[in-house]
């Protein structure tokens, strides 16, 4: 009976560690995507700043293009970059939390294995 409980606890801890590792990897992938979005927005903003005010600025929305002005496009790219930066910071905080939980689960797993011997 006790052996079955230990076996079940072992499986649960192992599942938790694997799930946490997968979530950390997924967070890293999301972080890369947001970092790329931030770089694109900042680069586009820098390019827009150097352009003339008299030009027409079009923004693609789905299958159509909207005519906008330079200031609104620069502001839009600034907000996109800020949102991506905020998401990256949130992902970093979540990663720290998950890593703490992973360390705790791994130590519990080690204790369980040692108690089984």
Curated annotation (Swiss-Prot):
Q: Single GO cellular component annotation?
A: cytoplasm
The protein's location, in the record's own words, is: Cytoplasm
This protein's source sits in the domain of life called Eukaryota
Gene Ontology molecular function: any one: unfolded protein binding
Its primary localisation, in coarse terms, equals cytoplasm
Q: Which InterPro entries does the protein's record reference?
A: PFD_beta-like, Prefoldin
Query: Is the Zinc keyword given for this protein?
Result: no
Which keywords has UniProt assigned to this entry?
Chaperone, Cytoplasm
Which Gene Ontology terms describe the biological processes this protein takes part in? gonad development; protein folding
Q: Which family does it belong to?
A: Belongs to the prefoldin subunit beta family.
Question: PANTHER family attached here?
Answer: PREFOLDIN SUBUNIT 1, PREFOLDIN SUBUNIT 1-RELATED
Subunit structure comment from the entry: Heterohexamer of two PFD-alpha type and four PFD-beta type subunits.
* Annotated function: Binds specifically to cytosolic chaperonin (c-CPN) and transfers target proteins to it. Binds to nascent polypeptide chain and promotes folding in an environment in which there are many competing pathways for nonnative proteins. Has a role in gonadogenesis.
The name this protein carries in UniProt is Probable prefoldin subunit 1
The protein's organism comes out as Caenorhabditis briggsae
